[in-house]
Amino acid sequence: MELLHSINDFNEAKQVIAGGVNSPVRAFKSVKGTPPFILKGKGAYLYDVDNNHYIDFVQSWGPLIFGHADEEIEENIINVLKKGTSFGAPTELETTLAKEIISCYEGLDKVRLVNSGTEATMSAIRLARAYSQKDDLIKFEGCYHGHSDSLLVKAGSGCATFGSPSSLGVPNDFSKHTLVARYNDLNSTEECFKKGDVGCVIIEPIAGNMGLVPAQKEFLLGLKALCEKYQAVLILDEVMSGFRASLSGSQEFYGVVPDLVTFGKVIGAGLPLACFGGRAEIMDLLSPIGGVYQAGTLSGNPLAVCAGLSALYKIKRDKTLYTRLNALAVRLTQGLQKSAQNYNIALETLNMGSMFGFFFNENAVRDFDDALKSDTEMFAKFHQKMLFKGVYLACSSFETGFICEPMTEEMIDLAISKADESFDEIINGV
């Protein structure tokens, strides 16, 4: 396999695009490689400009639960496209999508559509502060909630990839109201409550940006109780886990009903769309009926709404979808685990529905500190080996992988066999 055209394309991109990419992790910096420049995707496969193809376990970082270029979703988008791309005015499709989302999640009365997960979390926090009339926010080490200033504090994912706990350009005044607790640690969390006047707490119930690290059930239930005790708004960030881990996101596993929730990725099916929502008494504080301002030129645009609605309709029709995706994820993670054991390589694997993760780590990962103990050099070697064998994995050990509906057991078994070859070559210095 060669990447000559991709190398040339990347060099050209770096002349006109900052860093050569429009989102930092895509640069392959942490795996010391060159990113393949993608020509097209179809089903479970990606095709690059060098005529290579890959089994794609990234799926655009999660949105594509039905894989690339799904015919039904594409056809629906094209039909809507013929009527216009954006109107800046209400449409019936928006209301229909809102109803579909609300029907899947307990405690959700109303939603507001936005364009990105960052917008969703930023707006939810503003709303929560207005409702609680308290400024301080608790977040958790390793949880990523987008790149708004107050949330770029020990944010995992891209920050962990580049060895930085925060970001330049964020004034201290922006983050002084952000208190950081340890994930899966109630004592650490209550200490934060005692330190400040906490108005809201935001958490990924299934963290996907320090690798895949699910909350322990007793921790999430305890967090809900602490929020009630201290009269703070609980925000579950399900931008990644919503409609991915299950139809009801984390609620299938934990049964926790938040005050506010954020969704993204799957609800846009690959187009820019996210939302935040919650109890009516909180949501009704939003402008134009309340005093909390939030707006967006392209919010609820018909193309993205149509794509998301098409995906949700397909999900709801397919009663065994999540069972099949989970089975494939289990098959993959167990296969990787067994292969690593054959070469005495320390590897921890897990999945939550169609989300999966693995760490080159001797012990189970419960929080960000555990994740940082992983062997990132081993991950970089493994990633490059797999890439050149036609398996496209997330290019950071602090990211999550995804299964899509077009994948088959044969594809999973092929990926496992390529992992076995990769481990053999790494151990033998090939």
UniProtKB/Swiss-Prot annotation:
InterPro entries: 4pyrrol_synth_GluAld_NH2Trfase, Aminotrans_3, Aminotrans_3_PPA_site, PyrdxlP-dep_Trfase, PyrdxlP-dep_Trfase_major, PyrdxlP-dep_Trfase_small. It comes from the Bacteria. NCBIfam families: hemL (TIGR00713), PRK00062.1 (NF000818). It is found in: Cytoplasm. The keyword Cytoplasm applies. The modification N6-(pyridoxal phosphate)lysine is found at K265. Homodimer. One of its GO terms (biological process) is protoporphyrinogen IX biosynthetic process. Coiled coil: none annotated. Keywords: Cytoplasm, Isomerase, Porphyrin biosynthesis, Pyridoxal phosphate. One of its GO terms (cellular component) is cytoplasm. Belongs to the class-III pyridoxal-phosphate-dependent aminotransferase family. HemL subfamily. It comes from Helicobacter pylori (strain J99 / ATCC 700824) (Campylobacter pylori J99). The keyword Calcium does not apply. SUPFAM superfamilies: PLP-dependent transferases. PROSITE patterns: AA_TRANSFER_CLASS_3. This is Glutamate-1-semialdehyde 2,1-aminomutase.
